[in-house]
Amino acid sequence: MNQGKIITVSGPLVVASGMQEANIQDICRVGHLGLVGEIIEMRRDQASIQVYEETSGIGPGEPVVTTGCPLSVELGPGLISEMFDGIQRPLDRFQKATDSDFLIRGVAIPSLDRKAKWAFIPKLSVGQEVVAGDILGTVQETAVIEHRIMVPYKVSGTLVAIHAGNFTVTDTVYEIKQEDGSIYQGSLMQTWPVRQSRPVAQKLIPVEPLVTGQRVIDTFFPVTKGGAAAVPGPFGAGKTVVQHQIAKFANVDIVIYVGCGERGNEMTDVLNEFPELIDPNTGQSIMERTVLIANTSNMPVAAREASIYTGITIAEYFRDMGYSVAIMADSTSRWAEALREMSGRLQEMPGDEGYPAYLGSRIAEYYERAGRVRTLGSQEREGTITAIGAVSPPGGDISEPVTQNTLRIVKVFWGLDAPLAQRRHFPAINWLTSYSLYQDDVGSYIDRKQESNWSNKVTRAMAILQREASLEEIVRLVGLDSLSEQDRLTMAVARQIREDYLQQNAFDSVDTFTSFPKQEAMLTNILTFNEEASKALSLGAYFKEIMEGTAQVRDRIARSKFIPEENLEQIKGLTQKVTKEIHHVLAKGGI
């Protein structure tokens, strides 16, 4: 432990002297109040400290004490359904302890409840050889999540004691005799430094799709379990709603939601909505699988920088248990702004638009911790982390540094479009500018699993939308009637895809989530109409007659999004109805 004293204070940056025994990334207690800070730069005996709490009232001469430990998180039972701030302080227990609606400075509360007892069930017995990553036993943390207690990293040997029963997170539950003869006494909890990624046995190629229930994403721009996606868009385009929808309905085991520098009422929406929503995969409340990290815009700026790392470290912990995890960061732009502020106060050489020159590497460090892995341990298991980051470029300008550095790393780009949002088309993901580099892998995976021609249908639907975009300029100049019959059909079918398929109501209990079988049935109906109508045109029918003759079935196709999943056969039955009505138009002569 090293004690120095403050010489300057500049917002969240404090410089202290007499710190020659300290190290970069050490956690410090700053001032008489004992504020939490982290050393981010060392020059001789002077340490530059990033303080994670409000520094007003702190002055030169006050003491700074190092702990000798890096910024770490506590990992164990009690994480699920909990809400933490950026440095893993539990907000509900913080409020009870301080009797304040705001964060009181200098208050230290353990991240995991030291009084709560958890029922531990051993899975291994005394005398067995264990290595890092082996599952020693389980705790049923919620109705959905079985918390698997693992042997910590760099610990291996012979299990000499393991106890069943109810324990707090600090009680000794097992003992391991290591190769050097020492006895390691382990509890239900372990700690891990947030800036260091947790080790894995092997990184694997992600192939299984993350089903979000959002048709535009799952059909055209899918992301895999273990993939990375970015959601850039201007103010009001729907970034947060897209993130909330994925957090609610994605087919993952655990969701980590990081509210980083965004409005507090968005986290309030999460707290109000999530407990009432039922996960379609488990039938339980969505909060039973969710960890919330709230670092809203009125909280200290420096803690935003830590909140992203706190979230991804908790995600890695659950991944190591063999779970699939999704982490939502809303928004990485606010995190980058925190980096820019600290860089400016350190008087570092600025890069593009004042951001630090190392912005790209910091963003890469975060996203590369996502992925599909084979975990440590003698038991064979896989885990995944899917990272989805919202980006808030000023004025929707995606040429700014945060968006550009993000797009260099992620493989999925869901570009939110202000004109679409203004037309009340939600999700406002622009199908012409967005892309997914996982499309081929996901398409072939679904074709194998469902024995269908899904990837071909997706290609045909996208070709129709692209053809519509090329015809739009002609239509604006000379009108729709100047187009050929075939092109008029293309415009009509593209409108069906846009309005009846891609547009989705997040506030409708049925339309808010669509399974893959329902998506395929809906898309098949629209493509069947296009195919049969195109044949009818080539046989001499008129476009107007086809549209009038199929008005009823097209209306039923439009309303099929509101048909519940259990009535899927009703949607599939429309395919034959489409063919029958177009044949009926032809039978009447088509003219």
Curated annotation (Swiss-Prot):
It is an enzyme of class 7 (translocase). The keyword Transport applies. It catalyses: ATP + H2O + 4 H(+)(in) = ADP + phosphate + 5 H(+)(out). Transmembrane segments: none annotated. Keywords: ATP synthesis, ATP-binding, Hydrogen ion transport, Ion transport, Nucleotide-binding, Translocase, Transport. Its EC number is 7.1.2.2. GO terms for cellular component: proton-transporting ATP synthase complex. The keyword Ion transport applies. It comes from the Bacteria. GO terms for biological process: proton motive force-driven plasma membrane ATP synthesis. GO terms for molecular function: ATP binding; proton-transporting ATP synthase activity, rotational mechanism; proton-transporting ATPase activity, rotational mechanism. ATP binds at residues 233-240. Belongs to the ATPase alpha/beta chains family. NCBIfam families: PRK04192.1. PANTHER family: H(+)-TRANSPORTING TWO-SECTOR ATPASE (PTHR43607:SF1), V-TYPE PROTON ATPASE CATALYTIC SUBUNIT A (PTHR43607). This is V-type ATP synthase alpha chain. It comes from Streptococcus pyogenes serotype M12 (strain MGAS2096).
